[in-house]
Amino acid sequence: MIFYDFEVFRYDWLVVLADYSNKDFKTIVNNPDQLIEYFNVHKNDIWVGFNNKNYDQYIFKGILTGHNPYKISRHIIANKMPGFSYRDDMKKIYMSNYDVYNTLQHGLKFYEGSMGDSIEESSVSFDIDRKLTPEELKEVEKYCRHDVEETIKIFFKRKDDFIAQLGLIKLTGKPHLMPRTQTQIASQMLNAEALTDTSDEFDVDTPPTLNLSKYSYIKEWYLDSNNMNYEKSLTTKVVGVDHIFGFGGLHGAREKYHHKGKILVMDVASLYPSLMINYNLLSRAVVDPTIYKELRDKRLQYKKEHNNLHLPLKPILNKTYGAMKDRNNTLYDPRNANRVCIYGQLLLLDLIEN
């Protein structure tokens, strides 16, 4: 694995590369030939970075194909354009990129602080309209190396995400999917074809097996057209405890509750995947829903056999629901996503009542 990070200025660029297998750090400054040579030696490795999927890989590919890295950087940052749209010849360069940022929600500096490490910022402005001095380049290199070192730390703190990703690649047999998020890979594995009409978002119903009496008014709340709004919620007492029902899940807890002794914790295993299978609520973008069931059954089989391949299948099964709410994913199906959420809440309520 090669960890890497680019810093790009108008008249200068540099990259810090870390070959983790031998703990070798290398810095290349304004030298495309050196970068080409390094790439040719390591082109079959996995390239790891922080937001490299959206930025660094395109700087890398642009330099390899003779383009100006500063113009590429402006294309991505200032013009807010995707890196792949800069030049077609860059698409010919294949890199197996893994982006640590894929499974995170904050920038690198946030995690540096969270780990108790120093948050280093370079004093060299990216707006400098001249060549950098040797001293400035040295400072930028120090800052860049620090970011690579921090990326390595975060990577190993979250190595299970990487292991799961490798497992998915092994299952699909498609190494080009390495840079994708797990929800994107889920879409690929399920052969999803985007729906052309999703205007039935609030065409919801309730489980046909539902058996409610005391709390039937909660079921009716979901069927009331006045409540077809994500901002709406119902707060009501269930077995004497305030519960909130809505389109984001069921929440209920006793305030400032304290208990000393044994506490029974119960969890519904694979609730959403089970609902999607048993009530036919998988995204309608999936032409053959049996694929999802086969993946679920395969995961249970692997888990029973103590085969680690069950690990990458868990996020695929769980993230399918999230993809059904993502407009940019081919699995997007807000109606069925809403039904899954409603079914789950009402069936848990059924369990409480009965």
Question: What is each of the regions a protein language model found here?
Answer:
Residues 1-19, 270-275:
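Gly/Thr-rich phosphate-binding beta-strand-loop-beta motif of the actin/hexokinase/Hsp70
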